[in-house]
Amino acid sequence: MYEINIVKKLIVFISIVFSIAYSEIVYRVPIEGVIDLGLPPYVKRVIKEAEASNIDAIVFEINTFGGRVDAATQIKDAILSSEVQTIAFINRRAISAGALISLSCEKVFMTGGGLIGAATAVDMSGKKGSEKVISFMREEMASTAEQRGRNKKIARGMVDEELSFTHLVLNQDSILVEDIEGRKEGKLISLTTDQALKYEIADGTAENINSVLDSLDYK
């Protein structure tokens, strides 16, 4: 059986769930609430510790409406550079900056009724960011998706509602995307769990971390 270490932000302790016997150890890292500049150093420390301790995987349990683009970008960079397998478990929602963090992980799992997307950048007053900022976030999303083998058109559409496309190529087949939630002009793309699976943004569904690990054959 695997052992799950729960690592919580700004709290210096690790809660360990023991099994009678286990051969693999996994860190669980909650990403909740507003993503701010206090989060990247924490994530970097967790990854560094996991690498030094030969941890088998890190599961980022994500439930957030987003936050700062610069903070999310730092977290994304740290996850992409991780030598330990990284898994996003979207426990309800990964909106805005949460979507970027999710896409940076090697594997993405979502609960039933989950949501990912709507990642346009806004300023502190909630107004849409400048074209420069939108362009930056759009290409951050696209390049991250591409690096993980996910569809960069979908990722771009999560940031920029003005993008126009009617087809995607998945598994060498050209398919319509008219059924994607938020696809209509003037709206950002957001994907439900079923849609994220269909368009290869998510790898699977799970109702808890144990089922995520079971799906990946952790023992």
Predicted regions and their residues:
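Positively charged n-region of N-terminal signal peptides that target proteins for export
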Residues: 1-10
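Extreme N-terminus of proteins, especially the signal/transit-peptide cleavage junction
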Residues: 5, 19-24
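Soluble extramembrane regions of membrane proteins in the secretory/endomembrane system
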Residues: 23-219
